[in-house]
């Protein structure tokens, strides 16, 4: 089924980003950087990631295999690249921004069961590719609130050219170009140029073969982004341009840089955005406005302070499992002209008081992020107790808040052995319990996409740290959880001194906890995932608050040392 011109959503252009040779080349960062540049030129840009796995979404995938699950405002569980897109473009994306093979096949099979194909033999071409094209063009329509259609849709195709799994997506992109016309589509291919230590030279052949594979399925790339650990020589760039039939001006080198936020300026300096604008006829594009991004880069490269934050987690062997958390912490540092030195701490190392002291004695603050399952929980409790008793600024996220409640219940509220029904169904004091609406879902075994997901409001108590940081009495944050603070124990825990400073507007769900400032300088937990709405040039208030408190502790420690020496 061809895309009809009347249904094109105006003059929306498509940029497709593919990858070759190896995975994890940085296609997502390349796509996000292009989006950043085009947005800085005044264009309306939306982003999309096509994932070739058969999972419907990454919500039930192992963090060690997939990395973090990025949740959007509308409750979609998506790929971590969606987080890059939101941070680089400073936009909020939705469910349509992430498409998986599992979603495509589920939709097609459901249509077949309903008889919508009128007895046709359902095949990859045209039925699967038609559904992919429909999803590709979904964001080309005007917004529900009257927002105009975007000028550009940038679509990253996951996987590596040549993989069986990604072939339907690449074929669909080829068909979109055929149906919309070559002046409305642009293909960027990201490829590796490896350096061979034995011969002391860079090799262009892998890129040539990767482009040949792409051309064999009907796509001639319009631009090449060459990934390398050192600059690609001009002769090699000219050779690649010749052998791959790409304009020399469209062959750019994305060399490893100190910060991911340097990538947009690196691509701009080589003229990639200008070339794309010219080829797509985006005459409405203005010059790049670097004002906001330049201030960010100054904070990145010229920090006035350095602060050490311990990230106490159970998935630290794969940092991508906490990608948005680490980016939010760094952004909190940018807001204070500070470099955040992350100390990765396996929560198991903090189970004992001595272990927690050994791991946390040299940090200025800690962050305890979300997670699932019982492994590592006692270590998180140990880390939080050490931070609470020693005045170390601490921020708990989702499970981190729940651990704050459990630790306080055990050690301050007289509820020895308190736990969560997630970890210990038989605990005498289930201070964290399954949400009422989740009980039947868990019993039914339907775990995919069934948590409390997406944007929910919270009412903040006047005079609280969280209300001060947000500068508002009510805020909305993204959530991803099945468990909540058990209302039956709230009064007893609050009487012991832990302040439930944020709740759902109806007062039913606990959204924030904290210790008063006269008890602890910064001990704050949130049931939400505020890291998902943080931006590099606009740090989230809770993360900025943590870094500010950590800097205050650091300065106080230095003053104490000076006084002691005197």
Curated annotation (Swiss-Prot):
CTP binds at residues 23, 163-165, 203-208, 239. Transmembrane segments: none annotated. GO terms for biological process: 'de novo' CTP biosynthetic process; pyrimidine nucleobase biosynthetic process. It is an enzyme of class 6 (ligase). Residues 1-282 are annotated as: Amidoligase domain. GO terms for molecular function: ATP binding; CTP synthase activity; glutaminase activity; identical protein binding; metal ion binding. Its EC number is 6.3.4.2. Mg(2+) binds at residues 81, 156. InterPro entries: Class_I_gatase-like (IPR029062), CTP_synthase (IPR004468), CTP_synthase_N (IPR017456), GATASE (IPR017926), GATase1_CTP_Synthase (IPR033828), P-loop_NTPase (IPR027417). Gene3D superfamilies: 3.40.50.880, P-loop containing nucleotide triphosphate hydrolases. ATP binds at residues 24-29, 81. Keywords: ATP-binding, Glutamine amidotransferase, Ligase, Magnesium, Metal-binding, Nucleotide-binding, Pyrimidine biosynthesis. Pathway: Pyrimidine metabolism; CTP biosynthesis via de novo pathway; CTP from UDP: step 2/2. Allosterically activated by GTP, when glutamine is the substrate; GTP has no effect on the reaction when ammonia is the substrate. The allosteric effector GTP functions by stabilizing the protein conformation that binds the tetrahedral intermediate(s) formed during glutamine hydrolysis. Inhibited by the product CTP, via allosteric rather than competitive inhibition. L-glutamine binds at residues 371, 399-402, 422, 482. Belongs to the CTP synthase family. Homotetramer. Catalyzes the ATP-dependent amination of UTP to CTP with either L-glutamine or ammonia as the source of nitrogen. Regulates intracellular CTP levels through interactions with the four ribonucleotide triphosphates. This is CTP synthase. It comes from Leifsonia xyli subsp. xyli (strain CTCB07). The lineage of its organism: Bacteria, Bacillati, Actinomycetota, Actinomycetes, Micrococcales.
């Amino acid at each position: 089924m061809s895309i009809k011109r009347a249904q094109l959503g105006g003059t929306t252009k498509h940029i497709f980003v593919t990858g070759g040779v190896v995975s994890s080349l940085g296609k997502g960062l390349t796509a996000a950087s292009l989006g950043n540049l085009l947005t800085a030129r005044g264009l309306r840009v939306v982003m999309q990631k096509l994932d070739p796995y058969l999972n419907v979404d990454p919500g039930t995938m192992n963090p060690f295999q997939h990395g973090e699950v990025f949740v959007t405002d509308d409750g979609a569980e998506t790929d971590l690249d969606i987080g890059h897109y939101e941070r680089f473009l400073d936009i909020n994306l939705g469910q349509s921004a992430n498409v998986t093979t599992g979603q495509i096949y589920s939709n097609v099979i459901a249509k077949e069961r309903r008889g919508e194909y009128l007895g046709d033999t359902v095949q990859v071409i045209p039925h699967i590719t038609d559904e992919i094209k429909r999803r590709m063009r979904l964001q080309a329509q005007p917004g529900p609130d009257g927002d105009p259609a975007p000028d550009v849709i940038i679509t990253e195709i996951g996987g590596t050219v040549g993989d069986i799994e990604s072939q339907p997506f690449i074929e669909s992109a080829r068909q979109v170009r055929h149906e919309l016309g070559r002046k409305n589509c642009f293909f960027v291919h990201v490829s590796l140029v490896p350096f061979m230590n034995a011969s002391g030279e860079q090799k262009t052949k892998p890129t040539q073969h990767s482009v040949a594979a792409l051309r064999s399925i009907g796509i001639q790339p319009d631009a090449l982004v060459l990934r390398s650990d050192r600059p690609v020589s001009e002769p090699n760039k000219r050779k690649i341009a010749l052998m791959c039939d790409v304009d020399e001006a469209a062959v750019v080198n994305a060399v490893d840089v100190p910060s991911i936020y340097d990538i947009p300026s690196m691509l701009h300096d080589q003229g990639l955005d200008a070339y794309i604008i010219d080829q797509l006829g985006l005459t409405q594009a203005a010059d790049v406005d670097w004002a906001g991004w330049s201030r960010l880069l100054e904070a990145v490269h010229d920090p006035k302070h350095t602060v050490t934050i311990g990230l106490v987690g159970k998935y630290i062997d794969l940092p991508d499992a906490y990608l948005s958390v680490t980016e939010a912490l760094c952004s909190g540092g940018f807001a204070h002209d500070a470099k955040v030195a992350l100390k990765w701490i396996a929560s198991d190392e903090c189970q004992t008081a001595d272990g927690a002291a050994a791991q946390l004695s040299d940090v200025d603050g800690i962050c305890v992020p979300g997670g699932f399952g019982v492994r590592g929980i006692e270590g998180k409790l140990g880390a939080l107790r050490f931070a609470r008793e020693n005045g170390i600024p601490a921020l708990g996220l989702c499970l981190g808040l729940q651990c704050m409640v459990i630790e306080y219940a055990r050690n301050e509220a007289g509820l020895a052995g308190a736990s969560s029904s997630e970890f210990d169904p038989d605990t005498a004091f289930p201070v964290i319990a399954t949400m009422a609406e989740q009980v039947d879902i868990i019993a039914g075994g339907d775990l995919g996409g069934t948590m409390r997901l997406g944007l929910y409001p919270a009412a903040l108590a006047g005079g609280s740290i969280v209300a001060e940081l947000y500068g508002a009495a009510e805020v909305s944050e993204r959530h991803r959880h099945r468990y909540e603070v058990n209302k039956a124990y709230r009064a007893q825990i609050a009487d012991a001194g832990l302040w439930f400073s944020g709740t759902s507007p109806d007062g039913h769900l606990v959204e924030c906890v904290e210790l008063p400032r006269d008890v602890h300088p910064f001990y704050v937990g949130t049931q939400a995932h505020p890291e998902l709405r943080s931006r590099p040039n606009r740090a989230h208030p809770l993360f900025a608050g943590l870094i500010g408190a950590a800097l205050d502790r650091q300065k106080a420690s230095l003053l104490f040392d000076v006084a002691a020496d005197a």
